[in-house]
Amino acid sequence: MRKIRKGDEVVVITGKDKGKRGTVLRVLETKLVVEGVNVAKKHQKPNPVRGVAGGIVEKTMPIDASNVAIFNPASQKADRVGFKVLEDGRKVRVFKSSGEVIGA
């Protein structure tokens, strides 16, 4: 079970985008693609066969998972993730500061 999943809201805790918040769009092995964070400009060549216009395109690049923390909406701060087994046997993610279940 991963600590950060697709759809989670995260805060960048270090690097050039420190303090920015965004939603996780994609989870890679050790990196995350976060909406609006680590945006790079790519020079794209036109491809008439695919119908792609050329030019400078802004693309969201992956950021290392260690540089982000999950956002706790109750405290409005970055938080750490822990795991807890419920009475019915399900393993769920919880916020370390408050103990409440993430995504419930």
UniProtKB/Swiss-Prot annotation:
Pfam hit, one: ribosomal_L24
Keyword Ribonucleoprotein annotated: yes
GO molecular function list: rRNA binding; structural constituent of ribosome
A biological process from GO: translation
SMART domains the record matches: KOW
InterPro entries tied to this protein: KOW, Rib_uL2_dom2, Ribosomal_uL24, Ribosomal_uL24_CS, Ribosomal_uL24_KOW, Translation_prot_SH3-like_sf
Keyword Ligase tagged: no
UniProt cross-references to CDD domains, sorted A to Z: KOW_RPL26 (cd06089)
NCBIfam families tied to this protein: rplX_bact (TIGR01079)
Classification via HAMAP family: Ribosomal_uL24_B
Function description: One of two assembly initiator proteins, it binds directly to the 5'-end of the 23S rRNA, where it nucleates assembly of the 50S subunit. One of the proteins that surrounds the polypeptide exit tunnel on the outside of the subunit.
Record's subunit section: Part of the 50S ribosomal subunit.
Protein name (record): Large ribosomal subunit protein uL24
Lineage: Bacteria, Pseudomonadati, Pseudomonadota, Betaproteobacteria, Neisseriales
Annotated gene: rplX
